[in-house]
Amino acid sequence: MLAVMMTVALAACGSASATKMTMGTGGTGGTYYGYGGVLGQYIKNKAGIDVTVVSTDGSKANIQGIAAGDYQLGTVQSDVMAYGWEGSRSFEKDGKVDSFRVVAGLYAESVQLVTMDPEIKTVADLKGKSVSIGAPASGVYFNAIDVLNAAGLSESDIKAQYQSFADSADALKDGKIDAAFIVAGAPTPAITELTTTNDAYLVPIDGAVAESLMASCPFYTTYVIPAGTYKGQTEDVTTITVKATLIVSASASEDDVYKLTAAIFDNVDAITAENAKGAELSIENATSGMTVPFHAGAAKYFAEKGVNVATE
């Protein structure tokens, strides 16, 4: 199940009794994995917690992995986190999961619609096209369905393909699909690689489509991907986002979660130097828009910074 493992181990001279945690992230072609590795490094170096970062199938797998005790930390989409807590949508069959808590919101996860087909200028142009919409019941899948529905389309109006970010990029290059939904922090490695050697571009998700989405679902907000984010991108692209969120097992100790929260937010500049998404780390962003309770350890840290968050 775990395709790739990145161990952020304590040095040999470190304490043998250090807390050990495994962090579930996402595919290696997305932002979660690389960013998770950076966070794991700072949690190890500054909090003394031995973190192993693993590549997974993403948000739902990370929530279920924490529930099963396989992971203690995970990066998730804010909307999928809410589905797990409520037992809705992607968790409707499996049931609700309440064995996790929020550490912090991390960064905007852009819903990126990428194509190499010059005929595709709007979401409506996807009708009849072969489109990758993520794994069934994944966060990406539901984001894609929401966008399609807001544009007056359904899953049956497209030739749906269910692929990972990396597989979607390869399929676009090989002409096997016409477009792909990729939900991740921009720049996303899979899209960066694709645009480096191919004439690919992002399709805006704006206007009436974005307005409909935001009116029907509180998780979505508008976001602008700046010109120059990807090779050949000469203009800003407006889209929608959800929020990448770090969660932790509810059973983790208050002291450990306090220390790992401090390790992240006391080192924002250094983290940003290693991964550009670190620039979005802030107390305000970390604590706003969360629909699931915070862990007491994270709440303690944010309270010291003047922000009180709900823990139940």
Identify the function of each model-found stretch:
Residues 36-41, 54-93, 113-119, 166-171, ...:
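Pocket-flanking alpha-helical
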Residues 82-87, 99-105:
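Short beta-strand-centered segments that line the small-molecule binding cleft or hinge
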Residues 163, 167, 174, 184-204, ...:
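An extracytoplasmic/periplasmic, membrane-proximal ligand-sensing/linker region
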Residues 130, 136-146, 219-290:
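Ligand-binding clefts/hinges and TM-proximal coupling segments of bilobed small-molecule sensing domains
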Residues 78-80, 87-91, 155-246, 252:
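Pocket-lining segment of extracytoplasmic ligand-binding domains
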Residues 46-55, 61, 70, 198-199, ...:
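N-terminal secretory/targeting leader peptides
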Residues 1-21, 311-312:
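Short, low-complexity disordered leader/linker segments with a strong preference
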Residues 20-46, 50-52, 108-174, 288, ...:
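Bilobed "Venus flytrap"/periplasmic-binding protein-like clamshell domains
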